[in-house]
Amino acid sequence: YSVPENKSNREVFVMNADGSENQQITRTPYQENEVTWIKGGTKLAFLSNDNGSSQLYEMNPDGSGRKQLTNYDGDIEGYSISPDGKKLLFISQVKTKESTADKYPDLPKATGIIVTDLMYKHWDEWVTTAPHPFIADFDGNGISNIVDILNDEPYESPMKPWGGIEQLAWNTTSDKVAYTCRKKTGLEYAISTNSDIYIYDLNIKKTENITEENKGYDTNPQYSPDGKYIAWQSMERDGYEADLNRLFIMNLETGEKRFVSKAFESNVDAFVWGADAKVIYFTGVWHGESQIYALDLANDSVKAITSGMYDYEGVALFGDKLIAKRHSMSMGDEIYSVALDGSTTQLTQENKQIYDQLEMGKVEGRWMKTTDG
C-alpha cells in the first residue's frame, strides 16, 4: 500500500512449507490474486488485469514465464481447475437488467437509475449484473467450448455481495460441479436467505437440488477426497442471516444427510476435509476466540486442536499439518503451520520490523456471570 498515492497493489509471494525462502516473485502495477498451484506444482495460476480485464495467467514458481491463458470477453472473477486438469470453472458477470440507456436509447448519456423492484443495490454496488459460473475445456494453454451453467436464468452464483469461488466445487472425477444459488428474484430474493446446493452434471447437462427441504442458507460445498460425500454449511431457517451455521454431509450413493457438527454449539466457519475423508477440520468461535477443531465423522465428536487468545482464519490441509492465518489483539495476520497435536509454527514475519519497535500491552480475558448463571 502506498500512502502518498493512497493506492494498494497486490503482489505474489512464495515460500517453502517451513517458511524458509520467503520471496516476492511479482513486481508489477497490476493486481495479481487468487494464486493456485497447477500442472503438478510446476506452475502458478493466477488472475491479473494486465490488459485491462481480469484474466487467467500462469507463471513459473520464481515469477518468470508469465503467460496469459484466457482471453474471455469479460472479467474472470474467480476460477477452479478440475482435478484432471482438463476443465476450467470460472465466474463472470452477465447482464440481467436493462440500463436506463437501454430503455431510452434516445438518451445515451443518461446516468439516472430507475428502480421498480428489489434488489437494486448491494452496499455500494448497483445491481445490473449477476455472477454466473461457466465451464470450459482447458488444454493448459487456453479455453474453448464455454458453457454457462445457469444459461439464461436470472440468478446469481456465487451469491452477492461476498460470495466467491468457495461457493462452487468440482467433484473428484471432474464431471460434476456443486454450486450455491438462491433461485429467487425481486422482493422474494431480497428478504430470503433460502439458498441451496445444486449439482450440475457435465455429461447430461442436468442440475439437481440436494438441499431443497432446508429453508435457510446452504453454502460452500466441498466434495470429500474419496468422492463418496459432499459437505456444506447450512442454516436452518429462512430470513435469519445470523442463524447457526451448521455443517452437513451427504452420502452421494444413498442420499443420506447428516448434521455432523451438533456437538459444537457455535458456527462452523472455514472447513476442509482430512485426506482420509474420516475427519473434517474447521474454524469456529468459542468464548471470543476462533480456534481450529477436528470433527471425527465416526461419531461426530469435536476436539479443539488449537488454544490461546488468538483467531484462526481459513484452514488448508498440507500433508499431516494444517495451514491457517492467525491474528490476535497484539498481532496482525500471519501464516502458521498447525500440527494435529496443536503445536504451531509461525511461517511469515511480515510485520516483525514494526512489532520490534513497539512494546505491546498485556491482553487478558474477563468473564462475568449473567443473571441466569
Question: Where are the regions a protein language model picked out?
Answer:
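Beta-propeller domains
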Residues: 2-19
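Short, solvent-exposed loop/turn segments at conserved positions within beta-propeller repeat blades
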Residues: 5-10, 49-54, 125-129, 188-195, ...
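A short loop-to-beta-strand structural motif that recurs across blades of beta-propeller domains
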Residues: 11-13, 55-57, 132-134, 196-198, ...
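Short loop/turn segments that connect beta-strands within beta-propeller blades
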Residues: 16-20, 60-64, 138-141, 201-205, ...
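Predominantly five- to eight-bladed beta-propeller fold
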Residues: 93-152, 180-196, 245, 315, ...
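Phosphate-binding active sites in nucleotide-utilizing proteins
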Residues: 369-373
